[in-house]
């Protein structure tokens, strides 16, 4: 990843959904090797903010600007957004799912083994997604982060359904990503123990 100059700037951002103001006046900046943890009650706008950053939700007001990345690609094309729901095709095997992501999203020419090993899924490679447990499905969704390297990770409750060992594995991957100059914005109710991570609490329509 060539991320040494990567910088994300959010200015006076607002979000409205279904005629309801979710948040407004939100501003922050984030640089390479930095993580921002979003907290706040349900409905405060954590998921909406992540979707705005990923380009999946319209910006009601304000600006989102990425500098230092690939000028030919949008923020969404330089980021992985992993939502709180796992969008997986039940009939595909674990390895087929990863190979699909590599083909569809583009990746360096290597096998899927690295991603499988990173998330502890190698022994399940040929198993159909339909037979996976909730925790295994979550790990498969997160394997996309490794299978197709991108500098920005946008994670919505990434630890949902994960046991303690899997959470530790994920945190190690997140620390490794930051160590290589990556950027992470994550909404979570769990203290991930990311040294130096900044906190942004959403609530009552504004960032506090």
Residue ranges and their predicted role:
Residues 59-77:
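Conserved ABC transporter NBD signature motif
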Residues 99, 110-125:
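Conserved ABC ATPase "signature" region
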Residues 85, 90-106:
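Q-loop/switch helix immediately C-terminal to the Walker
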Residues 142, 181:
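Hydrophobic anchor residue at the start of the ABC signature
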Residues 128-135:
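Conserved ABC ATPase signature
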